[in-house]
Structures are given as structure tokens and as C-alpha cells.
Amino acid sequence: MNRRHFISAAALALFIGAYTPLHAQDTQLGASELAELFTRNTAEGVWDGMAYKSYFGPDGVTIYDPQDGDMLVGKWRINAETGEYESFWDAIGWTSYAVLRTQTGYAWRRNGKTYPFTLVEGRHVSQ
């Protein structure tokens, strides 16, 4: 009887495993991939409840445009050693973020939290 339960449980585990997508886990992008994705493009997402757009210029300038706030101009770069995106704002200095490829697009990861976003080709901010 115990053997039959074990075999049933093993069969169920195999069945579930066979139908779990292989790409279900988010993967962190590398430095060269990030530079190519971001340069001359705009990220659109929601950060802590506020919609935003952020443009990444080829000269290392980034423009952060929150839906209900003041536009900020800062700097951006990719850290080749860590493979992370870094942004600089006068009020806080350099801050690093892992960038993940997800099932629905991309996400920033900072301090254990993820913030989904999509990338739009070109510049889609006012300034």
C-alpha cells in the first residue's frame, strides 16, 4: 500500500514537472545585453504605485519622467563587473539594480523587490 502511494506521488510529480514552463524563472541579464537594450530606448513601468518613463541616452544621460511628478535628469551606466544597471541622481548618488528578463518583459530588482517594466524603442519623454 505505501509503495502504491509513493509511485502515485512520483507519477504526479513527473506530470506536474512536464507541464511547468522551462522559462518560468526570471533570469538576470548581463552587462553587454543591458547596454544594447537600454541605449536610445525608454523604459515604462510602475514604481511604488507611480507610473513612469525613463529614457537612456547614448551619452550616459537618463531622463526620469514620473506621471505625476517633476522630471529628473541623471546619469546611467552598466557596471561591467557586476552586470548591473546603475543610475546617479544628485540627491542619492549611484544606485545599482539587477535587471531581469521575465515572462512578461523585464523587471528591476532592488533590495529583494521587483518592479516590472517594458522597453519602448526610441525616446518617449518630453525633454
What role is predicted for each listed range?
Residues 3-7, 12:
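N-terminal export leaders
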Residues 13-17:
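Alpha-helical transmembrane segments
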Residues 9, 19-77, 81-127:
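Lipid interaction determinants
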Residues 1-4, 22:
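Intrinsically disordered, low-complexity cationic segments
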